[in-house]
């Protein structure tokens, strides 16, 4: 490693193992030796092979730099490439996450009303920040919501996101929309309305929330027509006024010819849900986008009365046109290479300063760590297919891969068990400068009611022995702890896990996913090898 300078990137990250692989490249878990944090390093291969893919990656790394928020996944670092004009791969360092909401929903039938409330609150809080920056995510779905053992969620995958400017032509702005149909707003099922709004993301959040409540997708359409059919089965036929404002003539004819359907009461569709939650869900799933609340309005709903706090629901500064001027012109691979290199320099302040001052050397004075990483990644890739890790979730496109960890031991595991070992849920805000992870939550003895018989989630609790400031105590008013089902007078085990849903739970693709016990061998206790609960009962951290 004699080619490293004071940047020391190669020495900084200790590569551990491959945790994901796909058409984009490879994901490895690593230890940041400077901070002690677990991270996920994504090697994205041949990013300039297709201009569209390179543009998507540029868009995402730029947005994740600009949108810094606790409910949005964070890029911690991007490694310096060995050559400014010839590099083909990039290495992006993310915070390490334990799972995604798709796996949590599929694996758990014991989520409580407190979980539902806090999950939705985080999603809307993150969405408020995104929308006030004039950004539309456009691809919100459970697989693009990361989750950890503390019930903290983060929005990821901004490859299809767009920044909205007042002079952006609508037709151009939406020509490449390819998001997942099941979470697609009705106005996107056939170019319904002349102007699209952030309400498309609100609809997606409503679909995700409904899926949390029931454990299965709300609108699993097989095609666009079927999607409209099952939407109107629940919501009823749109009003003539709504239909008249639809710009697509075929869509207008189809809806006008549709038999008149009466809406199904949400209390009938979701009989066990909180009435306040149902009223908010009805607003988010309004057929007409103008009837849906903004993220800020939804956060002010009575449903969040006991946890909402405007002080921790920040807005973003609108993103300037200059940041995304490349979206408004035809660009070449070399243009994108230069723009991505400029984004990488944001994580190398000294070189960025020289770049901006025009004093940058023609050759690299600060050699890259990429050469060192290539050898490690190549070795791990070679051994990846030998049964040491579980198969990673498949990607739908080539934007930055999700920082999602799959569990591994000496045998393959099914994706249905990825979140089997998420050990506890702690409702807390990531904005806080909390204590060291070794001391926070060191005592998590239940102080409220024990879990109901046969259930795994106890009551909402506070910290046991954590000394916090008055401000932090106000912040930390609500907490959900996952406890195993226990018999009366029995002790609480140190670790607990999300129970599995029915193994025939429907997947996002509409297929039935089953677990083949012949491939997994005899049952044995699941252990979260990546971010385990420690022997004293503390859950894993980011």
UniProtKB/Swiss-Prot annotation:
Domain called Protein kinase: residue spans: 13-304
* First-level EC class: transferase
Composition bias (Polar residues) maps to 488-507
Q: Which residues carry this modification: Phosphotyrosine?
A: 177
List residues binding ATP.
19-27, 42
Q: Which GO terms describe its cellular component?
A: cytoplasm; nucleus
Q: What is its EC number?
A: 2.7.11.24
Region ranges (Disordered) = 388-412, 482-542
- What keywords sit in the KW lines? ATP-binding, Kinase, Nucleotide-binding, Phosphoprotein, Serine/threonine-protein kinase, Transferase
Return the Gene3D superfamilies for the record: Phosphorylase Kinase, domain 1 (3.30.200.20), Transferase(Phosphotransferase) domain 1 (1.10.510.10)
Q: Which SUPFAM superfamilies match?
A: Protein kinase-like (PK-like)
Q: How is its activity regulated?
A: Activated by threonine and tyrosine phosphorylation.
**Top-level taxon of the source organism:** Eukaryota
Motif span (TXY)? 175-177
Q: How is it modified after translation?
A: Dually phosphorylated on Thr-175 and Tyr-177, which activates the enzyme.
InterPro entries per the UniProt record, alphabetical: Kinase-like_dom_sf, MAP_kinase, MAP_kinase_CS, Prot_kinase_dom, Protein_kinase_ATP_BS
The active site is formed by 139
Q: Which SMART domains match?
A: S_TKc (SM00220)
Q: Which reaction does it catalyse?
A: L-seryl-[protein] + ATP = O-phospho-L-seryl-[protein] + ADP + H(+); L-threonyl-[protein] + ATP = O-phospho-L-threonyl-[protein] + ADP + H(+)
Q: Which residues carry this modification: Phosphothreonine?
A: 175
One biological-process term from Gene Ontology? intracellular signal transduction
Q: Name one GO molecular function term.
A: protein serine/threonine kinase activity
**Listed PANTHER family:** MITOGEN-ACTIVATED PROTEIN KINASE (PTHR24055)
User: Which family, according to UniProt?
Assistant: Belongs to the protein kinase superfamily. CMGC Ser/Thr protein kinase family. MAP kinase subfamily.
Q: What is this protein called?
A: Mitogen-activated protein kinase 14
User: Which species is listed as the source?
Assistant: Oryza sativa subsp. japonica (Rice)
Query: What gene does this protein come from?
Result: MPK14
